[in-house]
């Protein structure tokens, strides 16, 4: 999940937080 945060912190962040990151 860290890759997504590094690739798109603004776009992915919301999804990762919702997923339980």
UniProtKB/Swiss-Prot annotation:
Domain of life, per lineage: Bacteria
This protein's UniProt keywords: Antibiotic biosynthesis
GO BP terms in the entry: antibiotic biosynthetic process
Function comment: Involved in etamycin biosynthesis.
Name used for this protein in its record: Hydroxypicolinic acid-activating enzyme
Organism whose genome encodes this protein: Streptomyces griseoviridis
């Amino acid at each position: 999940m860290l890759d997504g945060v590094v690739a798109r912190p603004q776009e992915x962040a919301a999804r990762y937080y919702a997923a339980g990151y």
